[in-house]
Structure formats: C-alpha cells, structure tokens
C-alpha cells in the first residue's frame, strides 16, 4: 500500500478479478468508502462489509466481487479500471467536458466540491471536478 489510496483500490480489485478471487480486502478511509459505495450502487461489486482487526484497531473493507463466465466456459474479467488523475498530474473537467465511457455503459468517478460521485450525477448537478478513474 502506497500513498495513492485510489490507485491501491484499483490495483487490488483488478488483481483479484484477474486471479478469480472472490473477495478483496482494502484499507478503509473516507475516500475508499465513497468509491466502494459507488461501485455497489452501479453493480460492479456484489457486497462490501467493514472489518476491524482487534490487534491494532485497523479498519478494512472486504469486497465481494461479481464474476462472469462466457457460454463456452472460459473466465472473462468483468471490471476494467483505469486511474486517470494521479498525485503527479491532476486532471480536472467542467461538467460539459466530462467524458462518456462506452456511450454510458461505463462510469467516470469524480471528486467534486460536493463529494465523490459518478459522471451522471455530476452532469445532473452541473458541477465538474477531478477525474479519479474510469470503470467499464
């Protein structure tokens, strides 16, 4: 785990999905909880629960991933995640310039002045912000 918590979340979920793991354990912060709420609401993950370790009182989120199989049987990852804005290069858009991912099939997660939200919610509220990641 590094200093970029969003990149850590994305990497953990992507690695677990590619290795066909059912669950992922990530550190719990305000940002990670908000991103996980969006993933739950949009249906990219099945379940999320908070876990507290008794030894050192650290809080973790345990995510249950949603998997998909093709008709012929081979495994196909359901999540494609891409980190856009990073600590070394912040990327901001106003609400008119927020990109659409696969014509609305994917989502863009933004950090706005009103909290972390999806691209659809930001367009409805007519506010822009920092583009955190793309998920499709």
Swiss-Prot record:
GO CC term (a single one): ribosome
Q: Where in the cell is it found?
A: Plastid, Chloroplast
Q: Which domain of life is it from?
A: Eukaryota
Keywords for the protein's UniProt record, in alphabetical order: Chloroplast, Plastid, Ribonucleoprotein, Ribosomal protein, RNA-binding, rRNA-binding
Molecular function (Gene Ontology), one example: structural constituent of ribosome
**Can you supply a Gene Ontology BP term from the record?**
translation
Q: How does it assemble?
A: Part of the 30S ribosomal subunit.
Explain the purpose of this protein: One of the primary rRNA binding proteins, it binds directly to 16S rRNA central domain where it helps coordinate assembly of the platform of the 30S subunit.
Name the family.
Answer: Belongs to the universal ribosomal protein uS8 family.
Name of this protein: Small ribosomal subunit protein uS8c
Whose protein is this, by species?
A: Citrus sinensis
């Amino acid at each position: 785990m590094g200093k970029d918590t969003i990149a850590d979340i994305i990497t953990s979920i992507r690695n677990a999905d590619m290795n066909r793991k059912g669950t992922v354990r990530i550190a719990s912060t305000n940002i990670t909880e908000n991103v996980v709420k969006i993933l739950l609401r949009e249906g990219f993950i099945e379940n999320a629960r908070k876990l507290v370790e008794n030894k050192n009182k650290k809080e973790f989120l345990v995510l249950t991933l949603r998997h998909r199989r093709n008709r012929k049987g081979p495994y196909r990852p359901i999540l494609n995640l891409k980190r856009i804005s990073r600590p070394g290069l912040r990327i901001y858009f106003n609400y008119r310039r927020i990109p659409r991912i696969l014509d609305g099939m994917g989502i863009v997660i933004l950090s706005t002045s009103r909290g972390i939200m999806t691209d659809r919610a930001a367009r409805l509220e007519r506010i822009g912000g920092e583009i955190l990641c793309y998920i499709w």
